[in-house]
């Protein structure tokens, strides 16, 4: 969700937000948008839609090589680190109780628990089908740390992943790192990410630009 929101901000397109539950989304996950009556689901396809319809290019100024690098980084984040985050939130009982469990709080009491457990089971089945869910907790944490370390190395001392100005992949990275760094959920991968000051600064930089009120509250 954060990825799409930042991409809309980078594109300077006006938008509104509404609360939604993953189970009610067209593809069973958030985000999705409605644009002039057209429903578009999946953050990558949403970006494609926005760029084609409104004639924008979130990677404007990037060379062919840099665009390829951006795509490779995005795949590492969304096809690997994302699933490590899914594991820590859905597979670990303490974190599930703090977060995803509450998606179902507004359901009628007679179906709430059954729906909650069925949804959790489907997510864990998807995690196993992806492959990461077949590993032990310690192995998942180690693999998650590798993606965090790789992202930190790719960012280096730059303000953004591919230079002085943000591009599309920075929105993806921000969504992932902001999600991982939230202190609400306990995990070794989160603590490892906190030890990489450039990733924390990257998150804070985008927060200051697009969500200044959040930083003031945190202070």
Label every PLM stretch briefly:
Residues 47, 51, 71-74, 78, ...:
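Non-transmembrane alpha-helical segments in soluble domains
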Residues 1-113:
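GST-like domain detector, emphasizing the conserved glutathione-binding G-site
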Residues 83-200, 204:
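GST-like fold's C-terminal all-alpha helical module
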Residues 209, 213-219:
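Charge-dense, extended regions
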Residues 18-22, 166, 218-219:
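Acidic carboxylate-rich catalytic motifs and surrounding loops in phosphoryl-/glycosyl-chemistry enzymes
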């Amino acid at each position: 969700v954060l990825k799409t929101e930042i991409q809309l901000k980078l594109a300077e397109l006006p938008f509104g937000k509404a609360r939604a539950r993953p189970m009610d989304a067209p593809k069973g996950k958030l985000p999705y948008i409605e644009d002039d009556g057209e429903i578009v689901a999946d953050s990558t396809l949403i970006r494609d839609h926005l760029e084609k319809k409104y004639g924008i290019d979130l990677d404007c100024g990037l060379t062919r090589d840099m665009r390829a690098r951006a795509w490779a980084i995005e795949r590492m984040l969304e096809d690997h680190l994302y699933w490590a985050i899914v594991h820590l939130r859905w597979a670990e009982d303490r974190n599930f109780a703090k977060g995803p469990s509450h998606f179902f709080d507004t359901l009628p009491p007679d179906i709430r628990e059954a729906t909650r457990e069925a949804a959790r089971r489907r997510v864990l089945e998807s995690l196993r089908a992806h492959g990461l869910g077949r590993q032990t907790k310690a192995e998942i944490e180690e693999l998650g740390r590798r993606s965090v370390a790789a992202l930190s190395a790719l960012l280096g001392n730059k303000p953004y992943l591919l230079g002085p100005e943000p591009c599309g992949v920075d929105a993806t990275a921000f969504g992932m790192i902001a999600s991982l760094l939230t202190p609400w959920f306990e995990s070794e991968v989160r603590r490892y990410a906190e030890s990489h000051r450039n990733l924390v600064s990257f998150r804070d930089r985008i927060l200051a630009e697009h969500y200044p009120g959040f930083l003031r509250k945190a202070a």
